A protein has these predicted regions:
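A conserved regulatory-domain signal marking ACT and ACT-like small-molecule sensing domains
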Residues: 20-195
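Long, intrinsically disordered low-complexity tandem-repeat segments
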Residues: 2-18
Length: 195
């Protein structure tokens, strides 16, 4: 947290510093799911801005024609008021928005190295469970996971932070698991993304 002048406003983490005051700024987790249509992100962002909430982190995707978004925003509006303000967006029942107050945790520096795991092969039950179990047993923390079924082909891409020195052992275990599943898997170190 930094303050350069007695009346300068600076927001760092989950605290807001202003003219001789220090107070906590709430963080809210907002999830929106439902039938995809153009304008959902704009509609949600406008409601949050109108309430004075600052959108900090977000992710959004389409899952087999369904819209799914999770975001974190900061401000001083109770979660029930935010949920009520979002309710008109789902008037026809095609969207569901939920809001929950969360504790600010800040960014946690990874203790290991980031890796990218890619898998493709014939779809079958248990692929995600088997691959993520290998990563979990090694102490890996999955930071992003995307899966997609395209016809009979199943694709999985995961970003994972692995403990120092664990890359080769994890690669060996993933190769064994991939053989059992009848899929192809690769793992490689990757650079930390800006986003």
């Amino acid at each position: 947290m930094s303050v350069r002048g007695a009346y300068q406003v600076s927001v760092r983490g989950a605290y807001q510093v202003s003219a001789r005051t220090l107070h906590r700024v709430d963080e809210l987790a907002v999830t929106v799911i439902g039938h995809d249509r153009p304008g959902i992100v704009a509609d949600v962002a406008e409601v949050l801005a109108r309430l004075g909430l600052n959108l900090t982190d977000s992710t959004m995707t389409r899952l087999r024609g369904h819209f799914a978004m999770t975001l974190i925003c900061t401000g001083e509006v109770p979660d029930d008021e935010v949920e009520a303000a979002l309710r008109p967006l789902s008037g026809d029942g095609s969207l569901l928005a939920t809001v929950r107050q969360v504790r600010p945790e800040g960014e946690i520096a990874p203790e290991g190295r980031p890796y990218l795991v890619s898998l493709h092969g014939a779809d079958r039950l248990g692929i995600v469970a088997a691959v993520t179990r290998v990563l979990a047993r090694a102490g890996g923390n999955i930071t992003d996971l995307t899966t997609r079924l395209v016809g009979p082909l199943y694709v999985l891409v995961a970003e994972v932070d692995l403990p120092p020195g664990a890359g080769e052992e994890v690669a060996a275990h993933l190769a064994t698991t991939a053989g059992e599943l009848g899929v192809e898997v690769t793992i490689r170190p990757c650079e930390v993304d800006v986003l």
